Amino acid sequence: MIDCGKDWLRRVWDVAPTAIVLTHAHPDHAWGLADGAPCPVYATEATWALLDHLPIRDRRKMPRGKAISINGVKFKAVPIQHSIRAPAVGYRVSIGSRSFFYAPDIAGLPNRKRTLGGIQVFIGDGAVLTRSMVHMKAGQLIGHAPVTAQLDWCESAGVARAMFTHCGSGIVRGKARQLNVLVRRLGRMRGITAGLACDGDRLILAARPSA
């Protein structure tokens, strides 16, 4: 399970994941663990420093920039730009030869071609579609990059598919079908299959056919 926001409080015990991996310490990503966790929790040192108050027994440090294996799945924490107070990472997740990049809150992605190169799917920030929520503070980008900017990153890195999650109120309260059509169109303009992620969706990373 990646992230456990406050709306998952208590429900996480019913889900009973085998591991939880955190991107950053904002309430909508980590405060579902206010009553503890039913499994090991992985986070960067910067995130753990902000979560000292949570009664999590099995705390494991996630190194930045180095892949580790969790239950047979490789996770590589990549520093991204989103918040100064709660430094965030995105995760390059690999299973065999297939991989995806997950960053539900992101304003900027340094070294994007290297980070996204070779992935099959980009799963990004759905806070806003076209209106930027990014500004500069202390020399760092903070906030939320629009879907259009993230699609540009994917295009430049040769990523063929993109999904957007953690959607903002304008999307959640809007007409989902029409907005999804718009996202698909924005993707097609860049040669990318794109869409909005919905509750219950499943993403299958099919194995590459053998030669």
Predicted features and spans:
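Active-site environment of divalent metal-dependent phosphoester hydrolases
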Residues: 25-31, 48-50, 66, 83-85, ...
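Short internal beta-strands
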Residues: 40-47, 123, 163
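Conserved beta-strand hairpin/beta-sheet module of binuclear metal-dependent hydrolase folds
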Residues: 1-15, 87-104, 121
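Divalent metal-coordination and catalytic microenvironments
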Residues: 3, 12, 24, 75, ...
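Pre-active-site segment of Zn-dependent metallo-hydrolases
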Residues: 1-25, 31, 109-114
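Cap/insert and terminal regions of metallo-dependent hydrolase folds
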Residues: 109-201
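Short gly/ser/thr-rich secondary-structure transition/capping motifs
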Residues: 2-5, 57-62, 101-107, 144
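Metallo-beta-lactamase
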Residues: 43-89, 94-97, 197-200, 205-206
